[in-house]
């Protein structure tokens, strides 16, 4: 029991930097879109990627792509890559994977959401407030899909 407590005490997670890596806003049908009744269809795609920069130092990138259509036409497309540099130590591989695949993106999401909201308003469209994302559930789903894919490939071999 003391050994488990000691291992948890040695775990370390620090945010070194949160930064905007890439950004894009396109409104291909403006100003005509401003003349139409606003009934948007919002589609959110997201992805995360991580890589080790040095011993215990990781870059995590959260990519968000928001496509909003109105009357079957694209009103705007907004892409943001929100990055973070994190120092992580004292974690086993499964804990580290969760930290980089769920915990860190959860930290980055509010920054990306604010950037998207700001871009949309600057494009003079109605404000867009993205709902919170459950990165833990997405990560668990990813792990489950990976396990199923591994099982299928093992059965075929």
Curated annotation (Swiss-Prot):
It holds the Pfam family SecB. GO terms for molecular function: unfolded protein binding. Keywords: Chaperone, Cytoplasm, Protein transport, Translocation, Transport. Its main location: cytoplasm. It is found in: Cytoplasm. GO terms for cellular component: cytoplasm. GO terms for biological process: protein folding; protein tetramerization; protein transport. InterPro entries: SecB, SecB-like_sf. Signal peptide: none annotated. NCBIfam families: PRK05751.1-4, secB. Belongs to the SecB family. One of the proteins required for the normal export of preproteins out of the cell cytoplasm. It is a molecular chaperone that binds to a subset of precursor proteins, maintaining them in a translocation-competent state. It also specifically binds to its receptor SecA. Homotetramer, a dimer of dimers. One homotetramer interacts with 1 SecA dimer. This is Protein-export protein SecB. The lineage of its organism: Bacteria, Pseudomonadati, Pseudomonadota, Gammaproteobacteria, Vibrionales.
């Amino acid at each position: 029991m003391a050994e488990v407590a000691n291992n948890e005490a040695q775990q370390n997670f620090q945010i070194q930097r949160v930064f905007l890596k890439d950004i894009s806003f396109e409104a291909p049908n403006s100003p005509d879109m401003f003349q139409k009744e606003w009934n948007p269809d919002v589609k959110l795609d997201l992805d995360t990627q991580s890589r080790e920069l040095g011993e215990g130092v990781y870059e995590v990138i959260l990519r968000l792509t928001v496509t909003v259509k109105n009357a079957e036409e694209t009103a705007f497309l907004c892409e943001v890559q929100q990055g973070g540099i994190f120092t992580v130590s004292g974690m086993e591989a499964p804990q580290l994977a969760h930290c980089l695949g769920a915990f860190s993106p959860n930290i980055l999401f509010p920054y990306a959401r604010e950037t998207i909201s700001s871009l949309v308003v600057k494009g003079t469209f109605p404000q867009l407030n993205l709902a919170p994302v459950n990165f833990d559930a997405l990560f668990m789903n990813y792990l489950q899909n990976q396990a199923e894919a591994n099982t299928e490939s093992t059965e075929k071999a």
